[in-house]
């Protein structure tokens, strides 16, 4: 029926009004006007001519109209704009705001180290290797003194006890590497090592495996993904490594990798996983079955890429506010 459809418009300029609520006397909403101001009552064929309809909109005065009057008005409802003057509002707060983020100083390492690999296992943080290099000293007087050294130590930090412990084993001296945890073991791979003269550095092809429960270490020399600053995640029975820097040219520019490899930690077999959309050395994090690549040291990218391990598809997950790399 024609009277089952009606329209709500502004009385001032006859502009259709959307999101007008039409209610019955019991405040039950029976219709909402669409973007053309139109609403339908065809589901309510039991309405009598004396039933009252209520029309409400946040910017207009409420109006009530009988169903009979709605039909007399040719199914058009006019609402008057509600011009309200709001009183001044003052907001007070006794909450003290800090100029800086609050932090707590915890137990320090016995010796400073950076560019190490780390894993979190049962409330304990393991860090291994890293650079202890210093220099150049007193750069204000252009000193040429420089000392480059990589660590061969592993440390364990107990979060609850705020206590550091040194693992008794000596590991390979390496830095800019990665590590992953699986089935009670820590897998350490990638990065670079120094020559005996400490003038030349080499990509480290060795994989070290530390068994936490047995407190033993063994080495595997099968690593097809040799790079520094590589990303890695552990997914189910596999360790997935991505990108990194393969070498550094004489002009100090890095040659970045777009390779991806999957290492099955049960069988020990390696598999090529394809190529990344761009060559990069990203920070990686695993969320469910997706690897998120954040930032990019190759030019300092702002994009966040996502790799779906179930479908093998790449997607752009967003952009950082600032370049990171």
Predicted regions and their residues:
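Short Pro-Gly-centered beta-turn/loop motif in secreted/extracellular proteins
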Residues: 18, 40-50
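A short, solvent-exposed loop/turn motif at the edges and junctions
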Residues: 54-65
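Short, acidic Ser/Thr/Gly-rich low-complexity loop/linker segments typical of extracellular
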Residues: 28-40
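Hydrophobic beta-strand segments
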Residues: 20-24, 37, 53, 91
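Extracellular beta-sheet/turn segments enriched in Thr/Pro/Gly and aliphatic residues
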Residues: 69-93
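A short, amphipathic beta-strand motif
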Residues: 4-13, 37-39, 77
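Kelch-like beta-propeller repeat domains
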Residues: 84-325
């Amino acid at each position: 029926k024609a009277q089952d459809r009606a329209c709500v418009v502004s009385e001032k300029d006859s502009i259709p009004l959307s999101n007008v609520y039409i209610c019955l006397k019991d405040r039950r909403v029976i219709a909402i006007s669409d973007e053309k101001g139109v609403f339908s009552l065809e589901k309510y064929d039991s309405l009598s001519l004396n039933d009252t309809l209520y029309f409400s909109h946040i910017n207009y005065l409420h109006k009530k109209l009988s169903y009979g009057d709605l039909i007399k008005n040719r199914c058009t409802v006019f609402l008057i704009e509600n011009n309200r003057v709001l009183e001044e509002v003052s907001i007070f707060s006794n909450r003290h705001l800090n100029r800086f983020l609050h932090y707590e100083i915890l137990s320090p390492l016995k010796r400073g180290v950076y560019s190490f690999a780390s894993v979190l296992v049962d409330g304990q943080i393991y860090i291994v290797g890293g650079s202890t290099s210093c220099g150049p000293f007193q750069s204000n007087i252009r000193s040429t003194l420089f000392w480059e050294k990589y660590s061969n130590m592993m440390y364990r930090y107990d979060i609850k006890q705020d206590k550091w412990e040194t693992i008794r084993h000596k590991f390979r001296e390496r830095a800019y590497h990665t590590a992953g945890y699986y089935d009670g073991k820590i897998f350490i791979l990638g990065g670079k090592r120094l020559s005996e003269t400490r003038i030349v550095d080499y990509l480290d092809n060795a994989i070290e495996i530390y068994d936490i429960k047995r407190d033993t270490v063994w080495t595997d020399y099968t690593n097809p993904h040799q790079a520094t600053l590589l990303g890695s995640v552990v997914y189910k029975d596999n360790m997935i490594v991505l990108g990194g820097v393969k070498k550094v040219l004489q002009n100090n520019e890095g040659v970045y990798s777009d390779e991806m490899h999957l290492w099955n930690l049960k069988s020990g077999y390696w598999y090529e996983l394809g190529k990344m959309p761009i060559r990069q050395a990203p920070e990686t994090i695993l969320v469910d079955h997706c690897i998120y690549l954040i930032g990019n040291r190759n030019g300092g990218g702002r994009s966040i890429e996502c790799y779906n391990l179930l479908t093998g598809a790449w997607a752009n997950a967003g952009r950082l506010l600032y370049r990171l790399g």
